[in-house]
Amino acid sequence: IFQTMPIREVACWAHARRKFFELHKANQSTMAAEALTRIAALYEVEREAKDFDVSQRYAHRQQHAKAQIEALFDWLTALRPTVNSGAASAKAIDYLLRRKPAFTAYLDDGAFPIDNNPVENAIRPIAIGRKNWLFAGSETAGQRAANIMTLVQTAKANSHDPHAYLRDVLTLSLIHISEP
């Protein structure tokens, strides 16, 4: 994408949702509940378009999500002056309002995801194990561990058993190395 078009920020709706979720969890905020309902509607549009190709997903978003997002931002814009600037509610609202172009960018291309949850889920094991891997032995060993983790996550992303995938890849690489 970056070779054919300028780089474009596409914000993650899961991060926006999380801010309102935490707000609602902390004090049962009706404003946060309303925001969560509106964001859930956007995810419902995505569920409907899950198996669509890029152009169909784009058209579906234009027809179903665009007006919902405009209404959400209109609502937040009207609500913002009524919320104390230091309040957690203001921070959640401002997070969205200040990044409106990035949050609406996914509407412009059916290839853009609504969030980056798949990427975050793929790197979660690395983040969790980070302290365990501080002392991999050397920089080279750390690079090797990163290469193996890349293979494991690639296998998972393509619905393959990581153990079987690694066995096959490593076996084939040994065969290739031993051939004259």
Positions of predicted regions on the chain:
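Conserved beta-strand -> loop -> alpha-helix junction used to position metal-binding or nucleic-acid-contacting
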Residues: 3-37
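Short acidic (Asp/Glu) and glycine-rich catalytic loops that position anionic groups and cofactors
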Residues: 13-22, 42-53, 71-78, 101-106, ...
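Structural motif
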Residues: 28-33, 83-89, 138-143
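A ubiquitous short alpha-helical element
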Residues: 30, 56-61, 133-139
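Long, amphipathic alpha-helical stalk/connector segments used for oligomerization, subunit docking
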Residues: 35-101
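Amphipathic alpha-helical/coiled-coil segments positioned at domain termini
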Residues: 108-174
